[in-house]
A protein has these predicted regions:
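Catalytic binding pocket for nucleotide-activated donors in carbohydrate/polymer assembly enzymes
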Residues: 46, 50-128, 132-136
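Structured loop/turn residues at beta-strand edges in well-structured enzyme cores
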Residues: 42
Length: 173
């Protein structure tokens, strides 16, 4: 996007929306907020995580779990998963690839514009939709996949141990 520290210094920035650049780990001990990430998160109206690559992407999920609608991309595993869910309004997933930087920027701006114009009832509906999507990502639903992956890994490791001479560089990774 743009150099975040300089975004709000632009002369054309006279609207109500402000970007805050915080170069700290939000553990409650920073000199700017003195609050944890989660305490700050619950006060937000919407979050934006325009990931270029994240295998899963916990930050958009955390936002949703705290009833904060979020904007993410198709290059985050969570975004890809959330796009397949039925709930609408709590998560905006923007298709992102190597060549659509301008389009991604415009779509994020459009989504923020739409969120900023929601009335109280629509905002509450978006918050509930975000929370509903987060509940679907609970470990009680995903743990079976973890166990399945773990079982596959153990089976492959056992096969390598039984046949060490057949182990190649390719299947040891």
């Amino acid at each position: 996007f743009v150099m975040i520290p300089y975004l709000d210094r632009a002369p054309s920035r006279k609207g109500k929306v402000r970007t805050v650049f915080v170069p700290y780990y939000l553990d409650g001990h920073d000199p700017l907020f003195g609050m944890s990430y989660y305490d700050l998160l619950i006060g937000m109206d919407v979050t934006v995580f325009p990931s270029y690559y994240e295998p899963w992407g916990y930050t958009p999920l955390e936002s949703c779990a705290f009833h904060v609608p979020t904007i993410t991309t198709s290059l985050a595993g969570y975004g890809e998963w959330a796009a397949r869910q039925k709930e609408q309004g709590g998560v905006v997933v923007i298709d992102r690839n190597d060549s659509n930087f301008g389009e991604v920027t415009e779509r994020i701006a459009d989504a923020l514009f739409r969120f900023s114009h929601l009335n109280a009832e629509e905002t509450e509906k978006a918050r509930k939709a975000a929370a509903a999507v987060a509940k679907k990502a609970d470990w009680k639903h995903f743990f079976k996949y973890y166990r399945e992956a773990y079982s596959i890994a153990l089976t492959k490791a056992a096969a390598r141990n039984l046949n060490p001479q057949k182990t190649t560089k390719r299947n040891t990774k």
